[in-house]
Design a protein with these regions (language model features):
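Catalytic cores of the polymerase beta-like nucleotidyltransferase superfamily
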Residues: 1-301
Length: 301
């Protein structure tokens, strides 16, 4: 019986009826898309951050759907939709200003094609299990089928969330080399979800920090801003300094000057407070906080 259970888990993943997902936290738009896909005989699940946030009793803001339908099939099914992306084609399904991102199950490509920005090009489609394998962290690889209310967790993401552990899927060094921005994502999720990063991953991150130099500035800017706009900016700064990233991006974060530290902490606290109160946050204000010391010193000269 044990061998049979293990075989089933490897084939279909671990199915959970508990913990239960509060359907009321899922947007009606996302639910409608899944229903339409399933009615047309495609597999479809909500995956990623939305499910992770619901499991820790937070209200998700964004919903991603993974499906067996190809981008072209999705596009034909939803009139208000558009195909986007070069590295991997996605479909944005629109409902007014609301956008739901729908992606086709991915498989690992037989041969890697590295683009100019240092990231793998990846348009190989696959199965649900293969799609789970391609995701970065176990906490982002939990699938939910709202039709039968079941969670599918191939890599123990639910347990990792419960145990407050950030775990990468696959061999960490390979995964960080595939896309170095995962280093920043690891820090963001650790800060946002209060997860610990084990010593092995910490060591690998330190070894591969320089890979971030190959990423376009525009993409780095987006990821760094996300890191400080999760509502946990102070925690992010602690981790930023732990991995010596402040020196690369915002040296002021390493300042030992008491007045500079107080100014930075107040700016970060105010940003976190606005996010927790669901108020708008202008990234320009945060940048001004980071750059104020240097600008002020230049003015005084």
């Amino acid at each position: 019986h044990t061998n049979l259970i293990e075989s089933l888990k490897n084939t279909v993943g671990t199915l959970f009826i508990k913990p239960k997902i509060d359907i009321s936290k899922i947007s009606k738009h996302a639910l409608g898309i899944i229903l339409s896909l399933q009615k047309n005989k495609y597999e479809a699940y909500i995956v990623g951050g939305a499910i992770r946030d619901i499991l820790i009793n937070q209200n998700p803001k964004d919903f991603d759907i993974a499906t067996s339908a190809t981008p072209e099939q999705i596009r034909r099914l939803f009139k208000k939709s558009r195909i986007i992306g070069r590295r991997f084609k996605l479909v944005h399904v629109l409902d007014g200003r609301d956008i739901i991102e729908v992606s086709t199950f991915r498989a690992k490509p037989q041969e890697r094609e590295i683009m100019a920005n240092g990231v793998e090009r990846d348009n190989a489609y696959g199965t649900l299990k293969e799609d789970a394998e391609r995701r970065d962290f176990t906490s982002n690889s939990i699938y939910f089928n709202p039709t039968n209310k079941k969670l599918i967790d191939f890599y123990g993401g639910i347990d990792d969330i419960k145990n407050k552990q950030l775990t990468i899927i696959g061999i960490p060094e390979i995964r960080f080399r595939e896309d170095p921005v995962r280093i920043l994502r690891a820090i963001r999720f650790a800060a946002k979800l209060d997860l610990s990063i084990n010593s092995d991953i910490t060591s690998i991150i330190h070894k591969n920090i320089n890979l971030l130099e190959n990423i376009p500035y525009s993409r780095l800017f987006d990821e760094v801003m996300k890191l400080f706009l999760t509502g946990h900016a102070l925690k992010s700064v602690i981790l930023f300094n732990k991995f010596n990233l402040s020196k690369k991006f915002f040296p002021v974060l390493q300042s030992t000057n008491p007045s500079t530290q107080a100014f930075l902490k107040q700016g970060l606290r105010d940003t976190d407070k606005r996010i927790h109160e669901s108020k708008a946050v202008n990234p320009g204000i945060l940048l001004a906080v980071f750059l104020w010391r240097d600008v002020n010193e230049a003015w005084e000269k």
